[in-house]
Amino acid sequence: MNESHEAGKNSSTNVEEREEEVLRLARQFTEQSSYSTAGQTPFAAEAGSALDPNGERFNARAWCKAMLQMHIGDKEAHPLRTLGVAFSNLNVHGFGSDTDYQKSVGNVWLKTLSLARIAFGQKQRKVDILQNLEGLVEAGEMLVVLGPPGSGCSTFLKTIAGETYGFHVDKNSNINFQGIAKQMAHEFRGEAIYTAEVDVHFPKLTVGDTLYFAARARTPRHIPGGVNATQYAGHMRDVIMAMFGISHTKNTIVGNDFIRGVSGGERKRVSIAEACLSNAPLQCWDNSTRGLDSANAIEFCKTLRMQADINGTTACVSLYQAPQAAYDYFDKVLVLYEGREIYFGPTSMAKHYFLQMGFVCPDRQTDADFLTSMTSHLERVVQPGYEDRVPRTPDEFAARWKASPQRAQLMQHIKSYNAKFALDGEYLDKFKQSRRAQQAKAQRVSSPYTLSYVQQVKLCLWRGYQRLKADPSVTISSLFGNTIISLVIASIFYNLKADTSTFFQRGALLFFAVLMNALGCGLEMLTLYAQRGIIEKHSRYALYHPSAEAFSSMIMDLPYKILNAITSNIVLYFMTNLRRAPGAFFFFVFTSFILTLTMSMFFRSMASLSRSLVQVLPFSAVLLLGLSMYTGFAIPTGYMLGWARWIAYINPISYGFESLMINEFHNRDFPCMDYVPSGPGYTDVGLNNRVCSTVRSVPGQAFVNGNAYIESAYSYTASHKWRNIGVIFAYMFLLGAVYLVATDFITEKKPKGEILVFPRGHKALKKGKSDEDLEGGGGRSATVEKIGSDGLAMIERQTAIFQWKDVCFDIKIGKENCRILDHVDGWVKPGILTALMGVSGAGKTTLLDVLATRTTMGIISGEMLVDGQPRDESFQRKTGYAQQQDLHLSTATVREALEFSALLRQSAHVPRQEKIDYVTEVIKLLDMTEYADAVIGVPGEGLNVEQRKRLTIGVELAARPQLLLFLDEPTSGLDSQTSWAILDLLDKLKKNGQAILCTIHQPSAMLFQRFDRLLFLQAGGRTVYFGEIGQNSQILIDYFVRNGAPPCPPDANPAEWMLDVIGAAPGSHTSINWFETWRRSPEYARVQEHLAELKHERRHQTNLFRTTSGQKREDKDSYREFAAPFWAQLYQVQVRVFQQIWRSPTYINSKTALCVLSALFVGFSLFHTPNTIQGLQNQMFGIFMLLTLFGQLIQQIMPHFVAQRALYEVRDRPAKTYSWKAFLIANIVVELPWNSLMSVLMFLCWYYPIGLYRNAEPTDAVHLRGTQMWLMIWTFLLFSSTFAHFMIAAFDAAENAGNLGNLLFLLCLLFCGVLATPDQLPRFWIFMYRVSPFTYLVSGMLSVGISNTNVTCADNEYLRFDPVNGTCGEYMGSYMSNLGGYLADEMATANCSFCPIKETNVFLGRVSSSYSDIWRNFGLMWVFIVFNIFAACSLYWWVRVPRDKKPVAKAE
């Protein structure tokens, strides 16, 4: 190890001395650099020099030294600061139980009882996570934390970094951050950071932009070197990318599991680089080498070491499968065993501590693996004679440590440290001064952030613009959709006449315009939830306030909202002939725009106040109903019930609607177009004896005053016009403030932790062997025996040989072709375990995908044969493919997942019981009996990483693959014990004749030795070696040494050595072209000869077998795409989907709350509405508002479906488990029973409160019409669910499908006959009235609800006039006999009170509805439902079902 590392190992406990040493070394390093950097600054480095991050000779250590020297030489730069930590009596606990039952629709109410008991004082059971931990990590030191999954490594790192959500740190615990304690969690949050194992980034943002943003967010106030902040951040980005070997990905999007971007290993390095750019003096890394190859894992630790030596950074790192070279970089090690500390001290002494105790370290086992093996009775090896003297249980190990002299020495060091760095003492002031000097001048002293709030907003604006450029689809589709809707609305109400005949139409137009502008931002909620985890991570790094991102997104959306307001409203205003006055037009656009902003704040605040989307949807639906119903149009103010009138007062939309109505009607006189009485016999009647047929008309006037009309019909006052604008502004600022504050303080829902959960009634089986058992001396042999011969007799023995030759894979990036795989050759034989290795991004996973026929893009060339024959349609189902991502249905149990795979992927000729028995054997083989009935859960909850990986392999084994087994990174993210157990399993499968090809990262020497053959790829997908590994890797080593590689040291790991040899490790170089060396080697020639032999021999044997056995190529059972027939697939998938829905109470409860609360709200808002003219209109709008639930119903289904589809398309479809038809039909059918139940609840909660049943009483048809109403509601819900599947079938994102769905939904609403009757529609649009499903819903529901009963006018609905002579009855007799209506008093001789409508059927006729059409309407709804199902299936097949892609002919 280099000198600086040794200095780190023997660092003084005196922090001031350490800082002086750092300064001295910086000066010395600058003078003695092995690279000539004299006269250069890092920011002005000569191209190609050691300080140029874009050059090939870049040297990270030289750059760090130069950077530190420049910093020290600048008197204005902020003082350097370091941070160590001492902890003692550290206890961490949670509440609950080790096992919990799975929530379902049937038992979720029990959780409510449990919460009630807790609320009334019942204590929860305390679960200890960490117990009595003690340790000291000084500034500039590195601590490695070792332990198997579940030992508390993550909890320890989170505790040190101050992220204690979900658990509790005991109040008596002592943590001293070099004189700082309570301030660390808030004031200095970004100074101690925790980097989680999961990679969370904006997937459409490029790597370069992602890292530039992180660098810019932590840019200090004064930058040494004379560069500005932009240059500094750009340079830091380039440096960190060069350090971690990802410079080539600068312009590539980051991507995620579902959006293709950089490779998994590169994405992990992006996460590491982003955290490093925070420049935190104390860094906690949780298994951050997961997914990295050995070379990059070592380089990561080397970079941390360099930071520690030069900058005094403190690093605490948990590692699984740590290479020896990586372990050697650390100063201290903490070993955890089920939350107990069993060792803390120097790494160099840890191994000796346990050897002295009586344990044995096997040859070639790394120190880290040896230390971790102490936590498993199956792994640790005891010296002969020590069997009764070594500790066995966690408590015994902890007690041995407590009594050790090493622990006594540690406690003395902690005591000295605490005495030197007293809490809230001198060092706290120094730390604050250093932070203050780094912060922007406008930033608060106590803030954890570096930039000022304004700077944060500007930076987030820059990122928002980059994101918009990368993916403008949602914005463009929203703008396009809104413009189309505006054009449609404008064409429906085209060129309205300026007379009384258009009063209702003008109100309806303004109502719809207000809703369109106000509610068009609803989908913003989905976007906010999608990015919430990323923003919270950045907040933990103290990059920016979440509210700064929120504020910037508000600004970022302004151009779109302004453009949308202009384009939509100009079209709407002038095409419909609204008030032609400049002031009125600009007021209309202005009001619409501020309503859009206000409601955007409403939706955003709703999203920020809740912790998950499922929580907020039902309540937002009711709120939207309230906002829509209480605008003043659907229910005029006079008809609002007393208990609900306040809703209008707190409704911003109601103020906007009132202002727009005043804007349109104020001080205008509208000519009368229809008089009462009129027609034959009344032509000579004067104005004094007839009246305009409009509310608030005055006898003797040929016009109606606009002010009088809106005052009588809506209770609106002209003086409120500008007052309302002020109220809307107040709401905008209030809701905006709520949004910003809630964003900063309310976090998203976090995982509960990896605790086993079982279906209610199932219990965990106890372990067969416990840690209390006596120690044996055999160590790993116990594992081998444990998964020994059980069930192996049933494992399918394979005979087929799979071979490939000259396999190439090309994809198009931009206009250029990029070759990912370059002429790769190889084979896999039964009984042979082949490793596929290479650096990150070398194409390992791509090669597996190509060989397994799982690519959906690109051009494949080359030859791939099974027993000398081309792969047929059944190849995918006959191979097992254990993917790197452990993707499983979260609600299923382990046993159910295995049985599902066995029932659908094993041959249809195998009896069902045999398949079930086979699953039981697989469970035993994989040692999963203990949790066979446990629920899988989502990552972070349920099964842990190891259990998920076993399940992933088990699912493939349960399928009984006839050909071979592919495994992609089966040991990634696992500790050494579990990795060894996985290899034990693979070894057993191999010995039973399984053919296995397995990619692997970070194998230890012992792990690597267990493979038989190696296919080694370098960058660009080029073969470096394919052949046997040999005893102690000797054949492999001899090949490389013979071709110019330096000898492999005896204690080196050959897997790491060969990466260095070919120049694949960061910082390593080679002059040898190993690809060309391989192509010229005798080994390559032998491979080609053997491939030719295999092709000829196996093809001959296969043809001979077919001839002698009578087997024909047309054998459908052997060669068909799926093992199970379609109806068997549909049955199994349907059962699983029903189980999933039943076990998703949140989804069902959300659906129930949405339907029930909305129905109750509408029902009681219109409680027992009278049958006045306005009352009938209110009842019609009661139906209309119920239909507006459609948008929320499909929004609930779409995200749920997208998650299921992602699982199917990534795992089940490539494995040919079942067809897309079974998947789609099952997901559509599963909604049927729930929609039936919801329809009953909705019917009861809506139909009876409104009082529609009373209208059936006169005809004695209460039961019949009630049943008919329920049937119409039922078809509405069925139509909604099938329409949601129709919309989402082709789209990737629920947002885009939601935009299109909302567009079509609005069209259905517009043309249903409520806002504009068929007679009022332009002839061009009459076809839309006929094809809108809501036409038949409204017609059916309205006719069932109000037909065949009488109307009683309200007082303001009577038209009053004087007769010419005689009584009112005599005067109006002729008119009433022709046009209907009735008089309040036929015998009156003056002031006749005439009601224009006598029967509800007249009202129905005006909206083209008739009760006689009810069954026609019901039947047509079923036509629409069937069409949705057919369209969903057709679209899915056309857009998402991959077409057969045959490899092209062999190409050079």
UniProtKB/Swiss-Prot annotation:
* Molecular function terms, GO-annotated: ABC-type transporter activity; ATP binding; ATP hydrolysis activity
Pfam families cross-referenced by the UniProt entry: ABC2_membrane, ABC_tran, ABC_trans_N, PDR_CDR
Q: Where in the cell is it found?
A: Membrane
Binding-site positions, ATP: 838-845
Q: Which residues are glycosylated?
A: 2, 10, 228, 287, 311, 1350, 1365, 1391
Result of knocking out the encoding gene? Does not lead to growth defects or changes in developmental patterns and does not affect sensitivity to itraconazole, amphotericin B, voriconazole, posaconazole, ravuconazole, or echinocandins.
Residue stretches spanning the membrane: 474-494, 508-528, 554-574, 583-603, 616-636, 725-745, 1153-1173, 1183-1203, 1223-1243, 1271-1291, 1297-1317, 1418-1438
Residue ranges of domain ABC transporter in the record? 110-363, 802-1044
Among PROSITE patterns, the record links this protein to: ABC_TRANSPORTER_2
As for membrane topology, the entry says:
Multi-pass membrane protein
Q: Which family does it belong to?
A: Belongs to the ABC transporter superfamily. ABCG family. PDR (TC 3.A.1.205) subfamily.
Protein's name according to its UniProt entry? ABC multidrug transporter A
Q: Tell me what organism the protein belongs to.
A: Aspergillus fumigatus
Taxonomy of the source species = Eukaryota, Fungi, Dikarya, Ascomycota, Pezizomycotina
Gene that specifies this protein: abcA
